[in-house]
């Protein structure tokens, strides 16, 4: 019997499919020092670059292709990548013999989950968004359990072993350091407006920031992705990426945040009680960010502007209204907190430890 505790995590494509897994791993590492952690993802990918920063997680590259809902010539080649990914995952699992495989989303997560099913290895897939993406729909047919971030997602997984766990957030968000944002903004006394383009960067938000930063009396923090260079100007700081400690401080202590509406970002904003204006990503997506935002809008927990209707004047007016209307500001901040499950990382980690116990006892 394999008594060494090993767990494979898999997921990627964006930071929103990686950071929740890291949050779970951090909690597991804190609770049990005798677990080996592995991450299966694509070489040179977002997940590869992020996992490299965590020396206690072994990264193993697997091939995978994107499964599209629309016609594309790439579908013909990507289906073979998925098959190769399943085959490689099969032999990796046989070699390392993990007791559990945990998927955090993205197309790279499907081959390991399918391979785990073939080898009768316990597997769990976690859907971060309100409604499941294609990868999770596939994973749910093979996984032992399904974890969901929104209670409302239960309806998509009828006759399945589904558990509402919330979405794990990075440990740095539990106690943000106010000194960090003070240093980043050079101790500004102006309102702080932070604009995030997501882990891949968003051209529309980058252009928006450059167009409005000199039209509002505020300090702008701009996370731009890799398509722009980092810079610091008067009342403006731009960086391609901020580390977890910086992001936690920026989100907690900014007056207003303007962002895409990925599920991971929403949960981090909720943990901080942030005042957020969402500009959901629509083009080329399944509309998950629109639906993520809709459920917050219904609870008066955010403001939203559709990208197709986005204009400088509209966003400027919205920012000015928030900065001058304390009642509205407070309502938005208080209502978004309702979407934060404080014990999510701890809950999932303890569930996994119980799974280890059950597996080793059988």
UniProtKB/Swiss-Prot annotation:
GO BP: carbohydrate metabolic process; cell division; cell wall organization; lipid glycosylation; peptidoglycan biosynthetic process; regulation of cell shape
SUPFAM superfamilies in the cross-refs: UDP-Glycosyltransferase/glycogen phosphorylase
Top class in the EC scheme: transferase
Any single Gene Ontology cellular-component annotation: plasma membrane
Known pathway: Cell wall biogenesis; peptidoglycan biosynthesis
Main location: membrane
Keywords assigned by UniProt, alphabetized: Cell cycle, Cell division, Cell inner membrane, Cell membrane, Cell shape, Cell wall biogenesis/degradation, Glycosyltransferase, Membrane, Peptidoglycan synthesis, Transferase
Residue sites binding UDP-N-acetyl-alpha-D-glucosamine per the record: 14-16, 170, 199, 289
Highest taxon above the source species: Bacteria
Compartment(s) of residence: Cell inner membrane
EC number(s) given by UniProt: 2.4.1.227
GO MF annotation terms: UDP-N-acetyl-D-glucosamine:N-acetylmuramoyl-L-alanyl-D-glutamyl-meso-2,6-diaminopimelyl-D-alanyl-D-alanine-diphosphoundecaprenol 4-beta-N-acetylglucosaminlytransferase activity; undecaprenyldiphospho-muramoylpentapeptide beta-N-acetylglucosaminyltransferase activity
Catalytic reaction annotation: di-trans,octa-cis-undecaprenyl diphospho-N-acetyl-alpha-D-muramoyl-L-alanyl-D-glutamyl-meso-2,6-diaminopimeloyl-D-alanyl-D-alanine + UDP-N-acetyl-alpha-D-glucosamine = di-trans,octa-cis-undecaprenyl diphospho-[N-acetyl-alpha-D-glucosaminyl-(1->4)]-N-acetyl-alpha-D-muramoyl-L-alanyl-D-glutamyl-meso-2,6-diaminopimeloyl-D-alanyl-D-alanine + UDP + H(+)
Membrane topology designation: Peripheral membrane protein
Alphabetized HAMAP family for the sequence: MurG
Function: Cell wall formation. Catalyzes the transfer of a GlcNAc subunit on undecaprenyl-pyrophosphoryl-MurNAc-pentapeptide (lipid intermediate I) to form undecaprenyl-pyrophosphoryl-MurNAc-(pentapeptide)GlcNAc (lipid intermediate II).
PANTHER family: UDP-N-ACETYLGLUCOSAMINE--N-ACETYLMURAMYL-(PENTAPEPTIDE) PYROPHOSPHORYL-UNDECAPRENOL N-ACETYLGLUCOSAMINE TRANSFERASE, UDP-N-ACETYLGLUCOSAMINE--N-ACETYLMURAMYL-(PENTAPEPTIDE) PYROPHOSPHORYL-UNDECAPRENOL N-ACETYLGLUCOSAMINE TRANSFERASE 1
Membership in a protein family: Belongs to the glycosyltransferase 28 family. MurG subfamily.
UniProt name for this protein: UDP-N-acetylglucosamine--N-acetylmuramyl-(pentapeptide) pyrophosphoryl-undecaprenol N-acetylglucosamine transferase
Source organism of this protein record: Borrelia hermsii (strain HS1 / DAH)
